[in-house]
A protein has these predicted regions:
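Cytosolic-facing regulatory segments adjacent to core modules
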Residues: 12, 35, 39, 43-127, ...
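Substrate-engagement module of ASCE P-loop NTPases
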Residues: 151-167
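Pre-Walker A (Motif I) flank of P-loop NTPase domains
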Residues: 19-23
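P-loop (Walker A) phosphate-binding loop of NTP-binding proteins
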Residues: 28
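Conserved small/polar residues in nucleotide/adenosyl-binding loops
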Residues: 1-5, 165-168
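Pre-Walker A adenine-sensing motif
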Residues: 8-16
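Conserved glycine(s) of the Walker
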Residues: 32
Length: 168
């Protein structure tokens, strides 16, 4: 299944998202990885009407929803969090909230998630189109003695089959 993401140059390079893709977004801290992943989640959900699950190991779902609202409404998230918005911005937020509330996006912000726990949760989903894992480095590895690099490698390898078995 080919899904354009609304990022023209990236779509041209990657041909969009395909069902069996495992895509890792990597960059230095505070470069917008989470915001980018949330945009991909919303765009995928809008385009496909399929469920999107976001496993966030760093931020709570309230913070994620705030970021999604600000992005969808095209308002500054810092101003949204502080409540210092213009009346016209509040109208944009209300419209964005209405739009986002119609989308089947689910959040799991449980700390210490493991790949088997994640797979068990995904098995209950019937119309799954995308899984986002924010901050994969915080996932727990089955091998408690592994270095962080080894643990992330093992987690990544064990995630690839998820696209074959859980995405529709």
């Amino acid at each position: 299944m080919y899904k354009r993401q609304g990022f023209g140059q990236l779509d041209a390079i990657t041909t969009g998202l395909n069902r069996t893709d495992l895509i890792i977004i990597a960059a230095r801290p505070a470069m917008g990885k989470s915001a980018f992943a949330l945009n991909i989640a919303v765009n995928t959900c809008k385009a496909t009407k399929r469920d999107v699950v976001i496993f966030s190991l760093e931020m709570g779902k309230e913070q994620l929803v705030s970021r999604m609202l600000a992005s969808e409404a095209l308002v500054n998230n810092t101003l949204l969090r502080s409540g210092n918005l213009e009346p016209s911005d509040w109208e944009k937020i209300a419209g964005a909230a209405d739009t986002l509330s119609q989308l089947p996006i689910y959040f799991d912000d449980g700390a210490g998630c493991t790949v088997p726990q994640m797979k068990a949760k995904l098995r209950r989903m019937r119309n799954l189109g995308l899984v986002v894992i924010d901050y994969i480095q915080l996932m727990q590895s089955a091998n408690k003695n592994a270095s962080r690099v080894e643990a992330v490698s093992e987690i990544t390898r064990s995630l690839k089959p998820v696209s074959y078995t859980h995405l529709t």
